[in-house]
């Protein structure tokens, strides 16, 4: 009781309020806590090039044990600031990425870049917006078509996440940029002695794909324009994705960081594998349409021989 009286006197509040706080605080859910009280175990990171850090998502799908951690996410560190590239599939995953980042650098996060709006890449945005340590929150950057995409899909994504994660979905808000980069436009971001070149693509994997090229290391974050060791999933235009795959094959990047799967310095091989799959998928679907086959069955069997590579 002496300790209770001491705390009450120091805080200038009645004893019953101090006692209430002591009793209730341990019962608060994690998303009511701030700072280290709500911190998650940091994600495992790999430095794939100087100043370029990647967390590799697990090889799972959205139904088999999904926990918000299946996409490749990470960040690039300059001399003045940091850019985060994709934030994971939940607030908890985003917080774990932030914890890992803070173990490496205390530089401010100046930018959060979304390569596209699929839920496994974007639900962690809120983790970087809710606690800027007194500094201005980072600028959210994405393709200009991402905000309308999330306006259409957002409710569905939130319902799905609540079903998949239950209480683990707490704090997972869809926070998107208010503007964005238009198709064919490029944007240079300065992190201090380090520039990132962003490119907005025509419809391919989605209608709002964005890539991030780190000029200092030659590393290209492709988002889901490239899958390695995973079956590519289409939410855009198949012919457009083939065109984007061909364009990436001519890119000057020395290292490619895909949206899913391991990084590669042999991008031509990885892109050729993906192109074979997409081209076979297009051929098989066209053949099924010509034969008036059921499209549900077609999507289950098309390019079956190419999957898994």
List each language-model region with its residue ranges.
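Bacterial N-terminal signal peptides
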Residues: 16-34
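Boundary at the C-terminal end of the N-terminal hydrophobic targeting segment
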Residues: 37-40
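Conserved beta-strand hairpin/beta-sheet module of binuclear metal-dependent hydrolase folds
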Residues: 47-102, 210-222
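Active-site neighborhood of phospho(di)ester-bond hydrolases with catalytic His/Asp-centered motifs
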Residues: 85-87, 110-118, 141-143, 221-223, ...
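Active-site environment of divalent metal-dependent phosphoester hydrolases
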Residues: 91-93, 117-123, 147-150, 206-209, ...
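Active-site HxH/HxHxD metal-binding segment of metal-dependent hydrolases
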Residues: 99-184, 188, 283
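Core dinuclear metal-dependent hydrolase active-site scaffold
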Residues: 181-214
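Divalent-metal (often Zn2+) His-rich catalytic cores of metallo-beta-lactamase-fold enzymes
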Residues: 242-293, 301
